[in-house]
């Protein structure tokens, strides 16, 4: 049977590819490279412009995000037009759950082809020579496919199962609702997606900062360990540091464009 595995992020795709090789399989793995938990998504399925603008701002970079996002849009079209069985791998995190819902939306007219492999927090405790034990200590019990080692993913390969037509319809509807809300960010609470703002993230960073100079890396790193009901990435954490500097809420020793190497204080 022709199988295509879909997951969120390059790290997850690399681990999954290695897992398939360990299992003696050569199935195709596709990485979707967009953290859908953050930034505008209202027209993400029609135009890459708003998302590209957002990511250029976050990364403070002239990278051609528009081309990358256009390629992702074309990928969804090819998935929908193909005839392979599609397996979406997802953990319990906002970005992974949004990825699942987006794929369900695009494959809603061919529901017989859509499958899933679920990864729970307890799966992080599965003994494996390449396991990452630090991931199993998160107080929020959040998971993303990229947290799991190849050997742990091998153990989950048999769990891939079809998604019911009714659930696919519900997932597709939830994706449309998330797009329509177009919040600053999206959180996963009790397996439900809810809209959020940057207020609590910014306040957490201000609480971490003190009146003494502190490396921005430390502030961002500590913020990334806190519970926001979505996984805060390093790029987004440094972006929020720059935004707080621009708003005059944090002082900087260094330059905002080189925030990774700067020091910050209140």
Segments (PLM) and residue ranges:
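A structured, charge-rich N-terminal accessory region that forms the first stable segment of a protein
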Residues: 1-67
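Short, cationic-aromatic polyanion-contact patches
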Residues: 255-266
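Short amphipathic alpha-helical interaction segments
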Residues: 230-246
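A short alpha->loop->secondary-structure connector
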Residues: 25-26, 102-115
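A short, conserved structural fragment
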Residues: 245-255
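Long, hydrophobic/aromatic-enriched structural stretches that serve as scaffold segments
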Residues: 58-102
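Short acidic, hydrophobic short linear motifs in intrinsically disordered regions
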Residues: 211-226, 233
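A conserved mid-domain beta-alpha-beta active-site/ligand-binding segment of alpha/beta enzyme cores
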Residues: 131-214
């Amino acid at each position: 049977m022709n199988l295509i595995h879909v997951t969120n992020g390059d790290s997850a795709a690399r681990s999954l590819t290695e897992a398939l090789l360990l299992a003696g399989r050569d199935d195709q793995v596709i990485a979707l490279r967009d953290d859908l938990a953050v930034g505008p998504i209202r027209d993400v399925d029609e135009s890459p412009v708003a998302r590209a603008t957002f990511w250029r701002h976050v990364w403070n970079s002239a990278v051609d995000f528009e081309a990358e996002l256009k390629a992702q849009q074309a990928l969804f079209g090819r998935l929908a037009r193909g005839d392979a069985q599609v397996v979406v791998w997802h953990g319990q995190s906002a970005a992974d759950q949004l990825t699942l819902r987006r794929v369900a939306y695009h494959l809603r007219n061919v529901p017989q082809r859509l499958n899933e492999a679920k990864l729970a927090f307890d799966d992080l405790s599965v003994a494996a020579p390449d396991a990452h034990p630090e991931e199993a200590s998160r107080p929020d019990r959040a998971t993303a496919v990229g947290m799991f080692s190849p050997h742990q993913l091998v153990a989950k390969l048999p769990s891939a199962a079809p998604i019911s037509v009714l659930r696919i319809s519900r997932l597709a509807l939830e994706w449309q609702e998330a797009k329509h809300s177009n919040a600053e960010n999206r959180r996963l609470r009790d397996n439900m997606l809810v809209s959020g703002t940057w207020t609590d993230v910014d306040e957490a960073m201000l609480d971490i900062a003190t009146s003494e100079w502190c490396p921005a890396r430390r502030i961002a790193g500590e913020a990334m360990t806190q519970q926001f009901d979505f996984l805060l990435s390093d790029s987004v954490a440094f972006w929020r540091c720059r935004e707080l500097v621009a708003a005059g809420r944090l002082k900087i020793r260094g330059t905002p464009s080189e925030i990774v190497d700067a020091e910050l204080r209140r």
